[in-house]
């Protein structure tokens, strides 16, 4: 049997939910749109999995964090899709795609055809087994991407109360999971190869604050080395992590967060690629007519910096999906929409900490404020200056208005005459823009 739709979204993550909402706003008719997802649940806000989902008390659970609550919008329950005439194909994995013929095939043999396709397949976690790490297939080595992953991890946390946890990776997932494990009053060690945490974004000064804060919370941090092997007990459960520097760590549970890869293998050789993703224009149109790509998989023009980027973050997943849906409907009636003009935005929350970053982290940096990890209420930030202009801004502990101010600075790119004066002014500089 062939299922025919005017529009199909392949992928059921954050982008799918926000695209569906925008399709409805634009006037999609019942029966025109389908979402095909290999997950068993309707689109949800993925960031919850490394935060509130694992809280020791009152943990978040579906349906509480279906899209689009993450941006303050309506929660789109499965019934919402039914009411709007949107077909959800859950637990359905697409195994082949013919973009020229506009044809998809699922693992269970279902066939789909479409007029317009939105690729929203997101990223897959990088696994240590991909690199042939010895023992990396032992039980109780976890990765976190989907609700099923979080459920398995949560069960292990509750089952092994006095276990030793090792978190491999010093990025978003590593930092957020280490914090939530500590909130569960667990023994936690972080291991990562870089000289400091979050090296793609943080300066050494910013990282020093978070590493100090985590250490004060009792988290052991081991930097500059990697896991090269694991040993298991007679039940096949992990018991040790072997590090490249020769150290061996006891571990009953290991959580790996070493990044992701965009899931574009279905479309290899059919679409133009760039920077590891699918090349798109400012409307997320690909090189193939009537095919769009959004979220993690899209490499798009970053107008603000006259550059081309691929961005793995929930904010872009939401906004790119909305842009594509608007562009699709505009094209259907011979109209156009404004080009995507994205301001890069990243954020994280852990313990009592909350930071936001806007813009580009290139050039000279200026640190301001109180970045002492022992402070009762730390509040500090950093500006990035390139060619005499502020191009990026970071703030820990900001109020909503202060966070809006640093976003405004990053967008406006004001000139800086004296970096020492900028350091003295700190947040007040942003408030004046």
UniProtKB/Swiss-Prot annotation:
Keywords: Cytoplasm, FAD, Flavoprotein, NAD, NADP, Oxidoreductase, Redox-active center. FAD binds at residues 12-15, 39, 46, 51, 94, 145-146, 296, 314, 347. GO terms for molecular function: monodehydroascorbate reductase (NADH) activity. Coiled coil: none annotated. Expressed at relatively low levels in all tissues examined. InterPro entries: FAD-oxidoreductase/Apoptosis, FAD/NAD-bd_sf, FAD/NAD-binding_dom, FAD/NAD-linked_Rdtase_dimer_sf, MDHAR3-like_C. It is found in: Cytoplasm. NADP(+) binds at residues 172-176, 200, 259, 312-313, 347. Gene3D superfamilies: 3.30.390.30, FAD/NAD(P)-binding domain. It catalyses: 2 monodehydro-L-ascorbate radical + NADH + H(+) = 2 L-ascorbate + NAD(+). Its main location: cytoplasm. L-ascorbate binds at residues 318, 349. Its EC number is 1.6.5.4. Disulfide bonds: none annotated. GO terms for cellular component: cytoplasm. Its cofactor is FAD. NAD(+) binds at residues 170-176, 194, 200, 259, 312-313, 347. Optimum pH is 7.5-9.5. It comes from the Eukaryota. Belongs to the FAD-dependent oxidoreductase family. Catalyzes the conversion of monodehydroascorbate to ascorbate, oxidizing NADH in the process. This is Monodehydroascorbate reductase.
